[in-house]
């Protein structure tokens, strides 16, 4: 297993990942290159934060036979979130003629009981 994150991690965190046989790469997702193929690619709350979401998704679908994705959608651009993600982008990145969808769920998640909410997309898909 491989983890990619641009943030600096504590030695304790690095040790936990190493103990689970996960090789950590400290780099931006756009800069990560691997000739390795993966059974699954997992992405959680990533694409809003990257500089090039198209490049990240191209790498993911090229490298993995199955993807599990959770991303916030329809949120306005702000500091730290240079993109507004839309369902239509995921439809382009994971076209139904190339992918089988075990889960394709778009919804609203309420947070903290204070009325805060966000729209999300959750996908579990495998290449045909």
Protein language model features and the residues they cover:
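Class I SAM-dependent methyltransferase SAM/SAH-binding core
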Residues: 1-31
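Local beta-strand N-terminus motif with an aromatic residue
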Residues: 38-39
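A conserved beta-strand element that flanks and buttresses the S-adenosyl-L-methionine
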Residues: 42
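Conserved beta-strand signature within the Rossmann-like core of class I S-adenosyl-L-methionine
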Residues: 64-76
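Short alpha-helix
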Residues: 81-107
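Core SAM-dependent methyltransferase catalytic element
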Residues: 105-128
């Amino acid at each position: 297993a491989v983890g990619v994150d641009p943030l600096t991690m504590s030695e304790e965190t690095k040790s936990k990942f190493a103990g689970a046989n996960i090789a950590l790469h400290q780099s931006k997702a756009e800069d990560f290159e691997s000739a390795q193929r993966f059974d699954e690619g997992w992405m959680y709350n990533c694409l809003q934060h990257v500089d090039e979401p198209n490049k990240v998704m191209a790498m993911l679908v090229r490298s993995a036979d199955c993807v599990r994705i959770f991303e916030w959608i329809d949120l306005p651009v702000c500091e730290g979130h240079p993109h507004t993600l839309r369902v239509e982008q995921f439809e382009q990145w994971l076209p139904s003629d190339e992918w089988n969808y075990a889960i394709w769920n778009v919804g609203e998640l309420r947070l903290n009981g204070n009325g805060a909410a966000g729209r999300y997309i959750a996908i579990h898909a495998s290449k045909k």
